[in-house]
């Protein structure tokens, strides 16, 4: 009986979170990412966007997965020549703690150690965020994407420094406009 009550309660919580639709809106000219739930901005973040020659793609996309403690492999691009791969948790890993693909394989939202770049057009096309902000955003995306996790799960992820890919039950829409 207790198990049935717990399962029912868990399903109701998931349905409640899923019913409140999250969408992300990125304004490239304002260098801002808004998290919008049921038409209301619930979080607003300053971001870095693509610079001249490496613009952030515009359009409507979906986030289908969240990757915690991602490794970084230099892309096959001129700017990345001579750079070496960085494992999860490495201080020089430009992805930092989490990344969320919006246009695979090369464009994602991720943390940055270069906080001076926030509010600027400084990236190679990705959307960079402060580490605390991107962590909060990834938690929102997982919650509204049907994969909420308890706080101890996140503590383990941060402590272990191993890559964990979370596929969302419900992709989260993101619109990027100039």
Whereabouts are the PLM-identified features?
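Short acidic, Gly/Pro-enriched loop/turn segments at secondary-structure junctions
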Residues: 71-77
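Short, charged/polar surface micro-motifs in flexible loops or helix N-caps
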Residues: 69-70, 106
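Exported/periplasmic cell-wall-interacting domains
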Residues: 58, 77-178
């Amino acid at each position: 009986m207790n198990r049935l009550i717990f399962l029912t309660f868990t399903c109701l919580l998931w349905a409640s979170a899923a019913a409140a639709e999250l969408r992300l809106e990125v304004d490239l000219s304002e260098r801002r990412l808004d998290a919008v739930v049921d038409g209301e901005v619930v979080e607003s973040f300053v971001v870095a966007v693509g610079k001249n020659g490496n613009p952030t793609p515009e359009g409507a996309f979906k986030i289908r997965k969240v990757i915690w403690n991602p490794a970084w492999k230099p892309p096959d691009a001129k700017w990345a020549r001579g750079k070496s791969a960085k494992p999860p948790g490495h201080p020089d890993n430009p992805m930092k703690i989490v990344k969320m693909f919006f246009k695979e394989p090369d464009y994602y939202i991720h943390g940055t150690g270069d906080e001076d770049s926030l509010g600027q057009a400084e990236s190679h096309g990705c959307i960079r965020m402060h580490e605390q902000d991107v962590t909060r955003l990834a938690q929102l995306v997982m919650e509204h994407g049907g994969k909420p996790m308890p706080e101890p799960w996140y503590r383990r992820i941060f402590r272990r420094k191993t890559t964990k890919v979370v596929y969302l039950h419900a992709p989260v829409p993101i619109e990027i406009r100039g």
